[in-house]
């Protein structure tokens, strides 16, 4: 199993906080790091600070050397599709070719309402997502002069200079040149599967149990076959809440600290975790590894370990020590 560290940066994390986290993750042996892309904090914590995902990632790119970086996922409603391709390509150059790009339709209306952004209905957001994915491929892979007529975007004489960094191990486009890995994420809608089958290198299923992941994998396989694609060529991943402790007492202490960070003081951390046992990676190292094996049996190839204790850097060390290279 491959692992990435994932943080919810909109929960009050400054740039310096995120830099400390990614440096710790890189030193601990994580291969990749993702952060959320939200402009508003979650309900119950509306006054916490937020930062722009790609501005932060650009800074992190200059402060790290090995770990790959990305946002999981960037809503297509935040940035014009053409601007987003240029933005990602620029940050890719700054990183030396260590960027992965996650794309989603967006879901949090508060992100938009608080910042004057339009939040269209789900069909229009899915249309924008299709345009965004088409532009990523088109501007990275098509010859100069490319023409595109999408749902909301038109391109004439399309070209992108410079193109992505030609780093080893990256996907190769139809022009024979390498490009960043493209990840689409959703809870598994039929259209989301179709877009993943057509455009994605990886499909990320959010907050799912292994049983749901197994069922969704069959639907994703069918979408790949319908698109004329080998299902095995599409990597399957999941984002899973993660909380580890070396023993049960440490698990409960961390759960209580996590709830306090959510502004939910007075609740029982152990009871809160128990309600999520079928979809979180949690508990002692043995319990966590057992859950990882269940995801692997369901076809998951990479797990984004969603860490809700961003100031507990020892938790990052523990996740890396007990999971990375151990399952």
Q: At which residue positions do the language-model features occur?
A:
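Active-site-adjacent structural elements that line small-molecule/cofactor binding pockets in enzymes
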Residues: 1-327
């Amino acid at each position: 199993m491959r692992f990435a560290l994932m943080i919810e940066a909109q929960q009050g994390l400054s740039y310096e906080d995120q830099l400390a986290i990614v440096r710790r993750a890189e030193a601990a042996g994580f291969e990749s790091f993702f952060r959320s892309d939200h402009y508003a904090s979650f309900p119950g914590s509306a006054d916490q600070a937020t930062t722009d995902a790609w501005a932060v990632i650009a800074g992190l790119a200059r402060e790290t050397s090995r770990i790959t970086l990305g946002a999981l996922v960037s809503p297509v409603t935040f940035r014009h599709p053409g601007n987003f391709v240029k933005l990602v390509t620029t940050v890719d150059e700054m990183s030396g070719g260590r960027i992965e790009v996650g794309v989603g339709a967006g879901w949090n209306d508060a992100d938009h309402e608080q910042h004057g952004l339009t939040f269209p209905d789900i069909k229009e957001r899915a249309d924008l997502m299709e345009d965004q994915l088409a532009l990523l491929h088109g501007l990275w892979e098509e010859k100069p002069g490319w023409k595109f007529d999408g749902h909301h975007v038109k391109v004439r004489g399309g070209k992108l200079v410079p193109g992505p960094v030609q780093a080893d191990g990256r996907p190769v486009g139809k022009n024979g040149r390498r490009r960043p890995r493209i990840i689409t994420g959703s809870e598994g809608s039929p259209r989301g599967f179709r877009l993943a089958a057509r455009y994605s290198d990886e499909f990320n299923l959010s907050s799912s149990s292994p049983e749901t992941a197994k069922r969704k994998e069959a639907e994703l396989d069918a979408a790949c076959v319908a698109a004329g694609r080998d299902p095995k060529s599409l990597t399957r991943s999941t984002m899973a809440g993660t909380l580890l402790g070396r023993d049960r007492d440490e698990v409960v202490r961390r759960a209580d600290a996590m709830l306090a960070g959510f502004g939910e003081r007075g609740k029982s951390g152990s009871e809160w975790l128990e309600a999520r046992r079928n979809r979180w990676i949690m508990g002692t190292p043995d319990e966590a590894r057992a859950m990882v094996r269940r995801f692997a049996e369901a076809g998951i190839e990479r797990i984004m370990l969603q860490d809700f204790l961003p100031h507990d850097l020892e938790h990052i060390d523990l996740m890396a020590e007990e999971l990375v290279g151990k399952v």
